[in-house]
Swiss-Prot record:
One of its GO terms (biological process) is translation. Belongs to the universal ribosomal protein uL11 family. HAMAP family: Ribosomal_uL11. Interacts with ABI1. PANTHER family: 60S RIBOSOMAL PROTEIN L12, LARGE RIBOSOMAL SUBUNIT PROTEIN UL11Y-RELATED. It comes from Arabidopsis thaliana (Mouse-ear cress). This is Large ribosomal subunit protein uL11y. The lineage of its organism: Eukaryota, Viridiplantae, Streptophyta, Embryophyta, Tracheophyta.
Length: 166
């Protein structure tokens, strides 16, 4: 048997969920069961936390567990932030599969997303993070200020577009 867990110890558990939906408790059980938490209750807490802002989007949720209490924090991916910035109507995940988004977001939105993602980015400078987010825009299928995100990446690379560091 594994050793008993110290109840005052802080443990972080990461789970991918669809916003606003109660995930299967069976998928949560192996991760949080040993920590002395009820998977069904945690599933409901996650659904409640993600229902407002992230409904229908796949996001990562960080569960911080201490003293058999779980604190839910949403850790959105770059793609989730880009799709949220598109402000598209919510779709039924079960009916519509493999969606190509064809909206348009502003370059200011892209830099704002880059600032949010900056701590998790590998890039040395903010301009590199902005280029990462533009790459995500390509994958999502949206345009930025009516232009192809690849063209904007090229302009940043060549120094035609300046991105302030702060």
């Amino acid at each position: 048997m594994p050793p008993k867990l110290d109840p005052s110890q802080i443990v972080d558990v990461y789970v991918r969920v669809t916003g606003g939906e109660v995930g299967a408790a069976s998928s949560l059980a192996p991760k949080i069961g040993p920590l002395g938490l009820a998977p069904k209750k945690i599933g409901e807490d996650i659904a409640k936390e993600t229902a407002k802002e992230w409904k229908g989007l796949r996001v990562t949720v960080k569960l911080t567990v201490q003293n058999r209490q779980a604190k839910v924090t949403v850790v959105p991916s770059a793609a989730a932030l880009v799709i949220k910035a598109l402000k598209e109507p919510e779709r039924d995940r079960k009916k519509v599969k493999n969606i190509k988004h064809n909206g348009n977001i502003s370059f200011d939105d892209v830099t704002e997303i880059a600032r949010i993602m900056r701590p998790r980015s590998i890039a040395k400078e903010l301009s590199g993070t902005v280029r990462e987010i533009l790459g995500t825009c390509v994958s999502v299928g949206c345009t930025v200020d009516g232009k192809d995100p690849k063209d904007l990446q090229q302009e940043i690379q060549e120094g035609e577009i300046e991105i302030p560091e702060n």
